[in-house]
Structures are given as structure tokens and as C-alpha cells.
């Protein structure tokens, strides 16, 4: 069945127009070449082969071309020996290949393209794995070297900058150290000067203290000497209110006036002679008072009231001086005593003594009624 179908297929082109008979039909020739190259067909004689090809619609030219291409034109069937009868050999069925249309060509091209693509892919993989590393290895090394050189240049620049900064900082630190040393030297000079000034001041202060001590001692000596030798006693005086008033007589008006003036004069004389220094310098007032007294009243004037008061005041002053001496002995630090304080103490002592004397004298001068009124007030 297959051989009949194959025989029918090449018979179809015979019904084509005459243009196809003129041109050789390559597919038919190719099938004829394959048919002639078959080992069984080659054993058959040429006449039978030609006759079979003509039956299939091949022309003589095409048959000749098929014989030339197949190379079986000189083939002759081998002698089978003497035979009485020739057995007709049936020609084998020609296996005619079907007519390949244009789609089969595209398939062949596609398969070829796929094969070429596979080969190209293989070459590409080989190129990537083996050839590229060999080619690009040197380039990468060069790039790495360039990178290393760039990094080294950057590092050298940064190191140079840091070195310059360190040099500037060291210079500034050295300047600061020099300034600090200068300040330390100035402070040392100032301390030495301060020590010298303090020593000189201390010496001056000690000298001043010694001078003050000597002055204080001299003042104490003067005070003690003044108090050891009491002032010269003055004549005793009697207040005016104790003097008996005599009746005035017309024969002696001057005496009355003088006696009335004598009542006032003792007060003035006493006020002028309030201080002990002044008492010694006012003897005239005392003589006046005693000159006015009569011979009967001289015995009463012997009573020295003022001397008693003065003795009492001197006793109190001596007690105070003893207390002050004890306090001075207890106080070791006499360096801070000022001359003004000493003078103030002296003035207070003087005022206290004189004031007490004056108060007692005034009490003696005043009458009892006046003293009571003053106490009530």
C-alpha cells in the first residue's frame, strides 16, 4: 500500500503543464538517485530500471541525470551462471519519498538555527568562564593598582594635613607653656616682693608697736607720778550759805556791799577752781574769802571739806588704777592699744575725779531746801 501511494504521488506532477517537463524536477531526480543506489535495484538490469523510472513519469534526461548522480550507470548485473530459463525478476518497489513542501525547509532552518545557537551558547560560556578571566585579569589588576595608588595619595595628603595641624598645635602649646612660665615667674617675683613688703611692714609695725608701748608706759608713768604727788593744798573755803550774815550798819556800807559780793564770789571762785590743775593757780580767790572772814570764824574754816572729798576721790582713783593695772597684766597683747584710747581713758579719769569733786562741793554749797527741790525735780 505504501509503495502504491508513493508511486501515485510522483505521478501527479506529470499532469502539470509543459513548463515543468522542460525544467528538471529535482525532487524526482533525488528520489530516482536514491532508488538507483539501492543494493537490490542495482542487481537488476539497466533496461528494467529505465523502464520503471519512465513509468514513474521521468524523462530520459532526468533518468540520465539520476544515473549520473547515483553513479550506477556502469553497473551490470552479475552473471548467475548458465541457466536454462531466465526467471523474470520483479523490480523492487521504489520507495518514493514524499514531496517536501516549503515548510520542511523552514523546519530545517530552525533546527540549524537552534544548533548554531547551542554552539554559540557553549562558546559564550567557555568565553565567560575561561577566556574573560584571562583577558580581564590584567585589567582588574591594573584597576586595583590604580585604586591603591589613589588611596595611597589620599592617605599621604591626609597625613600631611594632620602633620601640619600637629605642628601648629605644638607651636601653640609651646607658646602657652612659655606664657605660663612667664606668668609663674611674675607670680614668683610678686610673691617675693610681697614677702619683702610684708617683712618690712612687719618690722615697721613692730617698731610702731614698740613706740606705742613706750609711749603708753611713759603715759602710765606720768599718770602714776601725777597721782602719787597730790596737788598743793589750798586754803579751806566755806560756802557762802554757811557764813553768818551780819546786820548791816550805816557806818559801814562798803562792807555790806563787799560782803554781799562775797556771797556770789565763792561760787565763781569755786567754778574756776573745779579742776585740780586750776586749784593750784587760783590762790587769790581763797585769800579774798579768808580776808573777808572775821577772827571768830577762822576756826570754822579750818574744816577742810574739800580736802576730805579730794582724798576720797583719790582713794577711788587709786582703786581704779589698781584694777586697770591688773587688767593690763592679764592682757598680753598690748600691740593693738591706740594712743587715742589711752588719752580718752586719761580724760575720763580726769573728768571723773573732777566731776565727783565738783558735785560734792556743789552739794555742800547748796542749802538743804535747794537740794531737796533738785532731787524732787
Swiss-Prot record:
Residue stretches spanning the membrane: 109-126
Residues modified to Phosphoserine: 232, 282, 335
Entry GO MF terms: beta-tubulin binding; identical protein binding; microtubule binding; protein transmembrane transporter activity; protein-macromolecule adaptor activity; signaling receptor binding; transcription corepressor activity
Location in or out of the cell: Peroxisome membrane
Protein transport in keyword set: yes
Top-rank lineage group of the source organism: Eukaryota
Subunit: Interacts with PEX13; forming the PEX13-PEX14 docking complex. Interacts with PEX5 (via WxxxF/Y motifs). Interacts with PEX19. Interacts with tubulin.
Modified-residue entries (N6-acetyllysine), positions: 34
Organism name: Homo sapiens (Human)
Family named by the database record: Belongs to the peroxin-14 family.
Keywords, ordered alphabetically: Acetylation, Membrane, Peroxisome, Peroxisome biogenesis disorder, Phosphoprotein, Protein transport, Translocation, Transmembrane, Transmembrane helix, Transport, Zellweger syndrome
Gene from which the chain derives: PEX14
UniProt region (Disordered), positions on chain: 1-24, 230-377
Annotated positions of the N-acetylalanine modification: 2
Bias (Basic and acidic residues): 360-377
Cytoplasmic face residues: 127-377
Matching PANTHER family: PEROXISOMAL MEMBRANE PROTEIN PEX14
Disease in which the protein is involved: Peroxisome biogenesis disorder complementation group K: A peroxisomal disorder arising from a failure of protein import into the peroxisomal membrane or matrix. The peroxisome biogenesis disorders (PBD group) are genetically heterogeneous with at least 14 distinct genetic groups as concluded from complementation studies. Include disorders are: Zellweger syndrome (ZWS), neonatal adrenoleukodystrophy (NALD), infantile Refsum disease (IRD), and classical rhizomelic chondrodysplasia punctata (RCDP).
InterPro entries reported in the protein's UniProt record: PEX14, Pex14_N, WH-like_DNA-bd_sf
Function: Component of the PEX13-PEX14 docking complex, a translocon channel that specifically mediates the import of peroxisomal cargo proteins bound to PEX5 receptor. The PEX13-PEX14 docking complex forms a large import pore which can be opened to a diameter of about 9 nm. Mechanistically, PEX5 receptor along with cargo proteins associates with the PEX14 subunit of the PEX13-PEX14 docking complex in the cytosol, leading to the insertion of the receptor into the organelle membrane with the concomitant translocation of the cargo into the peroxisome matrix.
Membrane topology classification: Single-pass membrane protein
Feature: compositional bias, Acidic residues: 323-342
Principal location listed in the UniProt entry: membrane
Protein's name in the database: Peroxisomal membrane protein PEX14
GO biological process: cellular response to reactive oxygen species; microtubule anchoring; negative regulation of DNA-binding transcription factor activity; negative regulation of DNA-templated transcription; negative regulation of protein binding; peroxisome organization; peroxisome transport along microtubule; protein import into peroxisome matrix
